[in-house]
Amino acid sequence: MQRDYLIRVETESMPDFKRLNGLMIGFVIKGEAHIYDENNMTQCNSGDIFIINHRDLYRFQLQQDGIICYIQFQMKYLADKFDDAHCLYFHLTDATTTKNIHQLRNIMARLVSTHIRHNELSKLTEQQLVIQLLMHMIHYVPRTYHSNQSILNDDKVNQVCDYIELHFHEDLSLSELSEYVGWSESHLSKKFTESLGVGFQHFLNTTRIEHAKLDLTYTDETITDIALQNGFSSAASFARTFKHFTHQTPKQYRGDRPAITENQQSAQHNYHDRELILLLNDYIEEMNHFIEDIEKMNYKEIAFKPTNQQLNQFNHIIQVGYLRNLLNTQYQSQLLTCHHDFQVNEVLAYDVMPYIMKKLNAPFTYDAEISNIFYDIDLCLDFLLDHNFSLTMHLNQYDSRDYIDAFKVFIHHVALHVSHRKDLKFNLYVTTLHTSLIEMIDYFKALFPNGGLYIHLDQATERHLPLLKRLEPHINHFVFDANSNDAVDFNKMNDDEFKTASQMIINKTNYLIDLMHRHNLKRPLILLNWNTLTGDTFITNGEYFRGGIIIEQLLKLSTKVEGIGYWLNYDLHVSHCRNERDYMNSIELFHQYNGKRPVYFTALLFNKLTSNILYSDDTCIVTGTDSNFQILLYDAKHFNPYLALDNQMNMRATEMIHLNINALEDGMYKIKHFTLDKENGALFNLWRKHHTIHGMDKDSIDYVNRMSFPKLEVYDIDITDTLALNIKMITNGIHLIEVKRYPSS
């Protein structure tokens, strides 16, 4: 691989300038080095990185005990890897984050250390690290494309030089190259000499000789083979040309360097391999990935400007099924966790009237002096009161006299129970309309003047419009359901269906808003039961990650819907479903054993956004102020969830987003970066890996719950005008970056 790249450690200064063909990146291992180009000198201290680009003049001068290392890529190697490699120009700036500098230095230190060790796997490891280094530079080091560099004033001469660098080993002629650029031979020869100070043949031979020197130094190939593979017609022609340029024969040149081998070249001056490896170890950190699997690059420039847009946070309504489930300490703990993380303050419970009617009509009579038929209900109410939760109760089949009487008994008891404490925030929710509701609401409002009424709204509601109008003064919210899975047949591959499904929730929301407008109904909306595309979750769980799709829906709904509903956990949700299709109508926050599902973290991250919108587009929103802001980036790809199971379809894609936030006030900022994607926070991905035929034991459960969290990175950065972030986005992933400027000292 020495024809492709060089790995060197230098302990001695360069006496003269050289012009680089290719790309060089390195860092100071120890001491101090001065890196010179045509116009400037850069002082580099221990750990500092330097980059020298194609055709740059350079020289380095090492101070006492100074050591540098570098990797030099040949242009032919780069041209095989990148389009327009000869125009690629890397430059480290203030926008290059400390994290990225550390990672570059880490990769180089590993690469040089591996090269010095020179064991049986060194070559393979070297090649992996070289690719990692180039990938990291492409993704994280600012770069531009220079079609004209200072060495050449004429673009066509530049093209000829690039062509020679890539094809020096072929039979090249002035005639061929003049045809390549569309000039006559004489004109090209004249322009070439004017620009470079040497003729075409001299430049071609110089290029060939420089490459031949590498082969003589680092390979055992015969001189004849080296001559032929570097563009010379014979060994004799090569020997004559080589002696003309170096004043030595190829054999003499190789004989003067018998002691230099691939691993010994690094141990120049007074340093042994072991000492160099110990010095390099100071720069080596753990690496998560060997090869970056980036498939797409995206560049985003953001400048804040005043907007009239506001982001509204949701009131979260958590369904728990039967009220008595609130007596379960695990469920209580889950509710309190939700309350802490994203301000959940409302619980929706099933109708308790059938339970009360059963007790009231029991064959034996409860002795009111020694028993309380509402004992368990009171304990549930106490929990809600203690933690400031509101209670919404779903009334169902309330058109009988027995039901209405039981309702009045229940409401009266609740009013008495809470009268000596603080008012319970109490709401009623009905999915069907009946005239008996008027009597019940009048009684309810007499005891709970601040109580609310939620009415389910759909097309069927229009048939009861007169009754709806009579109840309107008491109505606080209209409630609706929307399930994207209803819009598609998962056994088909019709893209139009999946496109329609991606808009299903927002389209139904807009339909109901229009319905309310037509009938002059002005109340906020609650989306109670809803879901994005999932398919059969028993199959797709752990494979189809959809956090970005959920966050996309929340952002679209934030100005249209006041409340969002979730089931508390998997067991409660499943126990109240008739079948799998019914289960697909809603989303739960927790799985079994208190494992938090990605939707939980989606709600948590969304809750970190503030109301003032500074910037927004199809995949990004920024909220806050210019000194304390939150950046939310997400990917939302709507496709058949079953395709996530097919490795041949490869629906998982990775995008690198280069994000610049411009015109920031200079200063030190704190960065908190949350990543939620299939690799970070996806519960079922880990669940499947640790599940056995006998289930999961406590150790496995605890481990999965500990590891199923979004990744968090925290660091400080000194910003001058621009914050540059490089974000690796996996399909349907979410990134939230909190940025806060420290006060000036």
From Swiss-Prot:
Domain of life where this protein originates: Bacteria
- Annotated DNA-binding ranges come to 175-196, 223-246
A single GO molecular function term of this UniProt record: DNA-binding transcription factor activity
Q: Which Pfam families match?
A: HTH_18 (PF12833)
Ribosomal protein: present as a keyword of the record? no
Q: What region holds the HTH araC/xylS-type domain?
A: 158-256
InterPro entries with a match to the protein in the record: Glycoside_hydrolase_SF, Homeodomain-like_sf, HTH-like, HTH_AraC, Tscrpt_reg_AraC-type_HTH
Q: Which UniProt keywords apply?
A: DNA-binding, Repeat, Transcription, Transcription regulation
Stated name of the protein: Uncharacterized HTH-type transcriptional regulator SA0097
Q: List the source organism.
A: Staphylococcus aureus (strain N315)
